């Protein structure tokens, strides 16, 4: 790949390897060259700007969950060497809560949840990111209820951090709109129909033995769970 370290064979290989290098191999300093200095990272909890903010957040998470593992389930991508790439990395993350931190005093409990990181990359550098993690699933597996945890967190921090909203977004450099891949278009159509409450699409498009995972660590089998969770 033009502009990328030759040890990476393709974009999924790049995404998976640097994720492990940063998190599991403790290569936090590599964020200075893998992440752009002014990268915006958009999360439900707000907007973070700059690789230093990402380094600080990573340090805090590792202090709270030192045995955290990030297991790559899949990486899908679009783009090319000249225009740059967009990746979507679906992750299973496991950890044990052995340190004090954002999730309160150490509980000694473990969790397994999913996360998805969408990253725009060019020339060996990630310059724009969107990240969502199942925080509700973490909270529940640590023995708390999400609403109670959120209220306690607001009280501890002296007020709520404003959640991410397009009104306070900033330009990160990625201006494309994906592509016209037939499978992406099909998924977009399924999700649009579900969000429009056309749940007939689930039985029409999902296998009867489908396994679905939803926010809050709620996983289940077949059409009934998929319909109920939505």
List the predicted regions and their residue ranges:
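C-terminal and inter-domain tail/linker signature
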Residues: 1-230
